[in-house]
Amino acid sequence: MKAIYLKKYGNSASAFEIKEMPIPIAAKGEVVIKVACFGLNFADVVARRGLYPDAPANPVVLGYDVAGVVESVGEDGAIFKIGQRVMAFTRFGGYAEYVKTVESGVALMPDTLDFAAATALVTQGSTAYFCAYQSTVLNAGDRVLIHAAAGGVGSLLVQMAKQQKCIVYGTASTSKLNYLKQLGVDMAIDYTQEDFSKVIRAHSNDQKIDVVFDSIGGRTFKNSFKLLAPGGRIVTFGAAEQIGGNKTNKLSALKLAWGFGIFSPIQLLLSSKAIIGVNMLKIADNRPHILSLCLREVLKMAEAGTIVPTVGKIFSADKIAEAHDYLENRQSVGKVVMAW
């Protein structure tokens, strides 16, 4: 089978190599899937830049989410059957024609979804669900700020917040503002042209924000924290600001950390504000039952039509470098999907 290896850190054009490797064999409690589509996540870009501490050493096959058909099951496997259409998490290894993963990370695909849409619900959908329903509570009337609201996670968070009857502010670049309005965002803010904090203060008559979902980090996080009302929560689940320019080095990570600012527990206590960090890889490793729950609940929402995943663009697997550039340059709306 073919697999796409990250052979060295740096620019996408020279980072990847497609190689042949054996088809994996399912052990007890595992499933082998013939992959139709796999997804790109911003963590893949961070890993390619050499800035993701959880990534294995090179050469490594990246990839967290796939959709395809069950090829084989391990000993005593009774949950899934050969030939079933499934969607699944992978702890790396997703950039391949066949993947092996644990049964708890696999779910049957609804008939209403194609492989690309299913891929868009695995990591992005589960992350959005965990952020919105496990890490915090969204109350009717809450003012919610979602950064990168046109992205794979952001677009699903918008839909979840609107389902809870929240007032939603969303940031995106100029070309994506109409998409945000179509999703139901109450105030779409062009972060490339405007200071989102000033726009929100002017639009809300200085009313504060109850919940922020932030995948950007750095100064965006710091400025978002200043907008929080007493009782407000900021859920941080990414650091896209870490990636900038063409250099790969640890200095950018240090600059990012400094940009977040320094907070003490007493500061949070006195202001009655909360900072909640979300790393879905840690959830997968330490609370796999919660990850499975998130995927099940997202599937229920998709089947009921309360959320609709957006597939922004599909690339063929041999265009992996082009797809990485597309995601890294923030051209994407919704999920970027690769197809074999």
Predicted feature locations:
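Short amphipathic alpha-helix with an adjacent loop that forms part of the alpha/beta core around
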Residues: 195-207
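Glycine-rich beta-strand-centered segment in the early N-terminal region that forms part
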Residues: 22-39, 51-93
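NAD(P)H dinucleotide-binding glycine-rich loop of Rossmann-like/cofactor-binding domains
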Residues: 37, 46, 85-148
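C-terminal hydrophobic helical "lid"/dimerization subdomain
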Residues: 284-340
